[in-house]
């Protein structure tokens, strides 16, 4: 399943991120705020446990808590820019990291870094990456995470190319994908068009 999250605030913030004139600090702020809006939608089907609580008015009242732990796994490095947006809503979420690079001979993603919390098998996992281009990195990230048997896996990104979305859904149809915008295509250099450029460079001001 994939869902394009259609909301006026998302459209407004994404437009600011797309602008070539947007400076790094503004880009980061809008990415964080946009991620908050995205994750609100992506987590609406999380399972709950019913609990009893005491309020200032009554001794016993019905309440709820998340059934499973939440683990955020940003794909380095651009995915790091989305973490704080989620943590502001789910401060108890744990964080893992996956680093991948593309082998220039095979064009396939190669893992260069991986660090996961110990409780990932008890967690609903949310993979974070602003861009879904060819889909290779996301597919490989899911391949790696599946070995740890999490409760579920979702992927949240900002912009996606049709080619990448199709590939992810073909290989991992059970992974729900949430996107702010489905863009036109990949250009000859592998960039999403109209896209928003190199998200990592724009987040960290390295270009």
UniProtKB/Swiss-Prot annotation:
- Keyword set, alphabetical order: Allosteric enzyme, Glycosyltransferase, GTP-binding, Magnesium, Nucleotide-binding, Transferase
Q: Which residues are noted in the entry as uracil-binding?
A: 192, 197-199
The record's EC number reads 2.4.2.9
Q: Name one GO molecular function term.
A: magnesium ion binding
Q: Which GO terms describe its biological process?
A: UMP salvage; uracil salvage
Cofactor(s) recorded for this entry are: Mg(2+)
Residues the entry annotates as binding 5-phospho-alpha-D-ribose 1-diphosphate: 77, 102, 129-137, 198
UniProt activity-regulation remark: Allosterically activated by GTP.
According to its UniProt entry, the function of this protein is described as: Catalyzes the conversion of uracil and 5-phospho-alpha-D-ribose 1-diphosphate (PRPP) to UMP and diphosphate.
* Family, per entry: Belongs to the UPRTase family.
Could you tell me what this protein is called?
A: Uracil phosphoribosyltransferase
Q: Tell me the gene name.
A: upp
């Amino acid at each position: 399943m994939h869902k394009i999250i259609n909301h006026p605030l998302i459209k407004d913030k994404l437009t600011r991120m797309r602008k070539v004139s947007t400076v790094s600090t503004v880009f980061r702020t809008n990415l964080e705020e946009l991620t908050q809006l995205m994750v609100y939608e992506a987590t609406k089907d999380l399972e709950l446990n019913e609990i009893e609580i005491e309020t200032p008015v009554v001794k016993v009242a019905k309440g709820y808590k998340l059934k499973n732990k939440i683990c955020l796994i940003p794909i380095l490095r651009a995915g790091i820019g989305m973490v704080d947006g989620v943590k502001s809503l789910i401060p108890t979420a744990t964080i893992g990291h996956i680093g991948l690079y593309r082998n220039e001979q095979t064009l396939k993603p190669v893992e260069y870094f991986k660090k996961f919390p110990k409780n990932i098998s008890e967690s609903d996992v949310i993979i974070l990456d602003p861009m879904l281009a060819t889909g290779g990195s996301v597919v490989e990230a899911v391949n790696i995470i599946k070995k740890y048997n999490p409760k579920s896996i979702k992927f949240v990104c900002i912009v996606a190319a049709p080619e990448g979305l199709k590939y992810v859904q073909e290989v991992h149809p059970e992974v729900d994908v949430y996107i702010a915008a489905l863009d036109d295509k990949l250009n000859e250099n592998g960039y999403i068009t109209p896209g928003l450029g190199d998200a990592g460079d724009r987040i960290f001001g390295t270009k």
